[in-house]
UniProtKB/Swiss-Prot annotation:
GO terms for molecular function: RNA binding. Residues 144-159 have a biased composition (Basic and acidic residues). GO terms for cellular component: cytosol. Belongs to the SmpB family. One of its GO terms (biological process) is trans-translation. Keywords: Cytoplasm, RNA-binding. It is found in: Cytoplasm. The lineage of its organism: Bacteria, Bacillati, Cyanobacteriota, Cyanophyceae, Synechococcales. Residues 141-165 are annotated as: Disordered. Required for rescue of stalled ribosomes mediated by trans-translation. Binds to transfer-messenger RNA (tmRNA), required for stable association of tmRNA with ribosomes. tmRNA and SmpB together mimic tRNA shape, replacing the anticodon stem-loop with SmpB. tmRNA is encoded by the ssrA gene; the 2 termini fold to resemble tRNA(Ala) and it encodes a 'tag peptide', a short internal open reading frame. During trans-translation Ala-aminoacylated tmRNA acts like a tRNA, entering the A-site of stalled ribosomes, displacing the stalled mRNA. This is SsrA-binding protein. The gene is smpB. The keyword Cytoplasm applies. Gene3D superfamilies: 2.40.280.10.
Length: 165
């Protein structure tokens, strides 16, 4: 009987620990996401504390592949408040992403095609690890954005009309 109780607790703690810490909604508007990959991030201690507190901005972020490694640029992680200025990290430093070699090579071949880029979509906790979702996206033109917005608006209207009846 105690095993069943422990099993319930572990399921609850796993569900609680898999939570989204930051999301890049702007990337989904600017890019048509073709594929997404989950990767780890190489972080410093104060960066981990800041991310867990929700002090991260993914909006201007992008990823590059240099010398076979995946690098995250322009993601702002605010300095941790309770650490002294000497021990804190640089907010916009380049961070290495941890992914399998096959995934990196596959992404590199796709990025070399015209018009594709790697953008961070969200940062989340997976157990005690901080992970990031990287999206392979193709930039949208202005008319594509307008068309997408019209489609979403019509879906909202239909949904609200069905809710009334």
């Amino acid at each position: 009987m105690s095993k069943a109780r422990n099993n319930k607790k572990s399921k609850l703690s796993k569900a609680k620990s898999n939570r989204r810490l930051a999301e890049n909604r702007y990337a989904r508007h600017q890019y048509e996401i073709l594929e997404d990959i989950e990767a780890g991030i190489e972080l410093l201690g104060t960066e981990v504390k800041s991310i867990r507190a929700g002090n991260v901005n993914l909006r201007d972020g992008f990823c590059l592949i240099r010398e076979g490694s995946l690098l995250l640029h322009n993601v702002h992680i605010s300095p941790f408040n309770n650490a002294g200025s000497f021990f804190n990290h640089e907010p916009l430093r380049v961070r290495k992403l941890l992914a399998h070699r096959k995934e990196i090579n596959k992404l590199e071949t796709q990025v070399n095609r015209k018009g594709l880029t790697l953008v961070p979509l969200n940062i989340f906790l997976k157990g005690s690890w901080i992970k990031i979702t990287i999206g392979l996206g193709k930039g949208r033109k202005l008319h594509d954005k307008r068309e997408n917005e019209k489609r979403k608006q019509s879906e909202r209207e239909v949904k609200s009309a069905l809710a009334r009846y």
